[in-house]
Amino acid sequence: MSTLDATRAELGLVVLYLNKAEARDKICRAIQYGSKFISNGQPGTAQDVDRSTTLARKVFRLLKWVNDLHGLISPPAKGTPLTLVLLGKSKNALLSTFLFLDQFVWLGRTGIYKNKERTDRIVRISLYCWMASSVCAGLVELGELKRLSKSMRKLARELRDTDKYENDQYKSKMKQSDERLLALVKAAMDVVVAVGLLQLSPKKITPRVTGAFGFVTSLISCYQQLPSRAPAIKVKA
């Protein structure tokens, strides 16, 4: 019975994960960039999958720009330095603009909006917004990591007579540090993906490089969307 309960709990986590629109979008993103890596920009089945998945993902993002607009007008966390607040708000504004413009890209790619030249221009503007938002996100994570490192050193001094790795507060800060470091890596790699999509350095950042970086960041995003596990309850025999 305990095995059945454990299986049910695991399946429940899978259902919870797949019910999240953001998680499904990131799975599709992994397929998109995986196909781009395989195709390397050459015509064929992989490129067709890349293009169709790219278009399908835009439906997931309709009106998603409202999320970052809400973040833009929300008050910052108490005690956050002004520099990090401004970078965070810039990230929200740029990402919201990217997602807003992406709706017009979808209209153009589906043929509803007929002006191809203007659609291509909107694509580039939106990608520049995404690249800039990724730069801001990376700088925010760097700043937060610096603040976190400082607070961890202070806490370590306070706990010098005990094992700091057994302290819940210190373990929580270590977990936050790992999460922010992963977010920093993702933001840096997203900048490379944006450069590849904009073809700013086509000789160095080829479609295959873009696909590889995009696939890795997609896996990171999928991991970040995983639901937290409830602590295991020991059952007496």
From Swiss-Prot:
Residues annotated as transmembrane: 93-113, 205-223
Keywords: Membrane, Peroxisome, Peroxisome biogenesis, Transmembrane, Transmembrane helix
Domain of life: Eukaryota
Gene Ontology molecular function terms on file: identical protein binding
UniProt record, GO biological process: peroxisome fission; regulation of peroxisome size
Entry keyword Transferase: no
Topology term for the membrane: Multi-pass membrane protein
GO cellular component, one term: peroxisomal membrane
Cytoplasmic domain ranges by topology: 1-92, 224-237
Tissues in which the UniProt entry reports expression: Expressed in seedlings, leaf sheaths, flag leaf, panicles and spikelets.
Induction (UniProt): By abscisic acid, H(2)O(2) and nitrogen deprivation. Down-regulated by salt stress.
Function: Involved in peroxisomal proliferation.
Family statement: Belongs to the peroxin-11 family.
PANTHER family for this protein: PEROXISOMAL BIOGENESIS FACTOR 11 (PTHR12652), PEROXISOMAL MEMBRANE PROTEIN 11-1 (PTHR12652:SF44)
Annotated protein name in UniProt: Peroxisomal membrane protein 11-1
Species annotation: Oryza sativa subsp. japonica
